[in-house]
Structure formats: C-alpha cells, structure tokens
C-alpha cells in the first residue's frame, strides 16, 4: 500500500513536470514570436518615406515564420495533451487511448485486444521503454 502511494506520487510529479515543461516551452516560444514581430515593425522617422519597405530576405522570413509557427503549435498541443494526462492521471499510451475514447463517448473495455500491425507495436514498445527508462532515472 505504501509502495503504491509512493509510485502514484512519483507518477503525478512526473506528469506535473511534463505539463509545466511544455507550458514553459510554449510561453518562451510566444515571447520570442512577440519579440520577432516587434523587431520587424517599420517605423519611419520624420523625413523618411512611409511607403518604402525595408530590405529583407523572403526566404529567411519564411523559414523564421515556419519555425515559430511549428514551435508554437507543438508547444500548445503538448501542453494540452500533458495537461489532459495530468488531470486524468494517465501515464501510458494505452491509458491515453482508453480515456480519450471514453471522453469522446466511445466506451471500450480494457480487456478487449486492440490488434496493431508489427511496425506500430514496435514503435509503441520503443516509446514505452523510453518513458520507463526516464522514470527509472
């Protein structure tokens, strides 16, 4: 019983750390995006023309926008998923699938065998081994 409480507390702390890490990543990314937008703003001085655009590289701007947008979406969705997992005490991918289906109104029993193809089962096993090795550290 005491071991179960320690294990649950350890799991909850790990879930909390993942959520706060994802939230911090999202906030830092949004701050960088805000700063990048402010830097690109063109404010002409009193004798400068206001219709002349400053020189810039379209390729660099596109790469910067793609990087910022990707980081913002990854941060937002990871915060959402880790928060969902923390709130519902989900620690494995299998639990996540069952809770998500239950949340969406598709109840499924834990005993039913969800068959996976060979590649998916290998990938799932690798991910669970990676997560379990993080828990052991």
Swiss-Prot record:
Keywords: Membrane, Transmembrane, Transmembrane helix. The chain crosses the membrane at residues 20-37, 66-88. InterPro entries: AIM11. It comes from the Eukaryota. Its main location: membrane. It is a multi-pass membrane protein. It is found in: Membrane. GO terms for cellular component: membrane; mitochondrion. Belongs to the AIM11 family. This is Altered inheritance of mitochondria protein 11. It comes from Saccharomyces cerevisiae (strain YJM789).
């Amino acid at each position: 019983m005491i071991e179960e409480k320690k294990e649950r507390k350890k799991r909850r702390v790990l879930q909390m750390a993942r959520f706060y890490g994802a939230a911090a990543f999202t906030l830092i990314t949004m701050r960088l995006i805000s700063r990048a937008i402010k830097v690109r703003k063109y404010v002409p001085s009193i004798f400068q023309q206001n219709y002349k655009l400053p020189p810039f590289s379209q390729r660099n701007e596109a790469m910067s926008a793609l990087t910022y947008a990707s980081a913002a979406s990854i941060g937002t969705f990871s915060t959402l998923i880790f928060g969902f997992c923390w709130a519902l005490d989900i620690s494995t991918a299998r639990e996540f699938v069952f809770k998500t289906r239950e949340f969406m109104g598709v109840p499924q029993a834990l005993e039913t065998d969800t068959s996976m193809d060979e590649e998916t089962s290998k990938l799932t096993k690798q991910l669970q081994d990676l997560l379990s090795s993080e828990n052991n550290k």
